[in-house]
Amino acid sequence: MEKKEIKLQMKELIKLMSEGVWEKEDMFSLTLLSSIAGESIFLLGPPGTGKSMIARRLKEVFAEKKQFEYLMSRFSTPDEIFGPVSISKLKDEDTYERRTEGYLPWANVVFLDEIWKAGPSIQNALLTAINEKIYQNGNETIKLPMKALIAASNELPKEDEGLEALWDRFILRVVSNPIANERTFYKMLKGKNKSKVVIPTELLITDEQYTQILEEVEDIDIPDNILKDITFIRKKLKETESQDEATSPLDYYISDRRWKKAVHLLQTSAFLNGRKEIDLTDLPILYHVLWNKVETIEPVMKIVTESLFWNIENKCSVVEKEYEKGLKTKGNALANSKIANINSEDFNIYFYFYTKLMGTNWGDTYFFLQDYGYLLMDIETKGVLYFDKDKNGWIIRRVPQGPFSSKKYPQHQIVSLRRAQGGIIVNNALYMMEPSKKASKPIFPPTGQQNLFSEGDTHLIEEMQKIGNELNQKMRLLEKENLFVSSTDLKVIQKYADNLGKKCEALEMKIKTSI
């Protein structure tokens, strides 16, 4: 089977399944993924958000269309799910056997609404059906044709009701929300109702193709870098579990069986995207696999996103530690010169209150002159460096301290400030204030920046540039199309990468100010 062909087939199926349904393409794609992987999926959401429609449309992608749909209640019986007992068999042959045609054991697509209302006898039979794809019908063991089990509810299973085992069997867990975008909502109101879709015969998934896919998915490689990312996720989940006092030990627990099925899901994603191995673009699918409670969705998404960039963050951390070590070991020589009082007339004044710093390699930079008197020689003061559009330049100011200083600045804008003769020390690099023609005496030293680090230390900048390139390359990979990663999930990744990029840029700027 050609990898390119399978991807085009899946892409077209997702498009057709999603026709006339708004903001649900990710649910259709993940439901298709789970069915082809032979796994189950749980849809969480209020009534009227398209959960049952997804199951009905999924049925249409298979050549053999057999669907069973049922709304559970506390009074539901096994007869209603698995079929009524055959009276004739019981009477004539003394055999307890169900007539399964038209019921769950007969269907290849099953949709069970309000799943958690099922009684213990139904739950036990479902566990076997999900785990082993078999159903014990009297003396006969039936191999189930079920390709997809889709369950739905507007709530999660309640604790201490014995539902944990059944809940663990739903590998994919997707939240179904009402339409969020108002323009999309208007399109839905104006659009024609289209309850059924027509799938061209050549796109239908036959039993033969389905079996072939399952076999070929087993050969999809799991690279070492993906295994390391998974190890990172496992460690982080355990750390979060131990640190979050508001959660129970099971809130972040992922069983070995669940991990095995999760990786099988990633292998299926890789295959259906036309690849021979799992890559980074598959990992965001774990957003919808590793959470156990609504409260853990956000932490889990954060951990999975971190797993995409942990090696880059580690490299940044190593550079930062080396930089900080250099600051400590190379001393405070720049601040030890004798400090004299300054006269504002000795310096050129800009924008009424600012003087210009010389030698900055990131652009014109202005220092709020009144802050000079608050700076100390041997103790760092927190400052802020930011770009002012009105002044078309960078501004450095002291961050006021005290009970009334409530304004907070992003971490990448924070710098350390110290006082020096005729200038200020920013992140341990001296920048002289621009002297005026009226200066009463020469300002020492006469040049702009005095370097704390030598030119031999430029390897830190080179390392940061390599890290920046690696981050850009990783984002280019992550932005490649994956049929089962939504634009919403991709935005989460992009936002995280942007923040990481700013953090790296801030560190690089700190280093540059010291070289």
Locations of regions flagged by a protein language model:
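Canonical AAA+ ATPase core
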Residues: 88-93, 109-122, 128-205, 214
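Terminal-proximal interaction/regulatory segments of ATP-powered molecular machines
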Residues: 298-515
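Conserved NTP-binding/hydrolysis module of P-loop NTPases
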Residues: 74-94
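Pre-Walker A (pre-P-loop) alpha-helix and adjacent loop at the N terminus of AAA/AAA+ ATPase modules
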Residues: 4-46
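C-terminal helical "lid" subdomain and adjoining coupling/linker elements of P-loop NTPases
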Residues: 219-221, 236-311
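Conserved alpha-helical scaffold flanking the Walker A/P-loop in AAA+ ATPase domains
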Residues: 30-34, 87-110
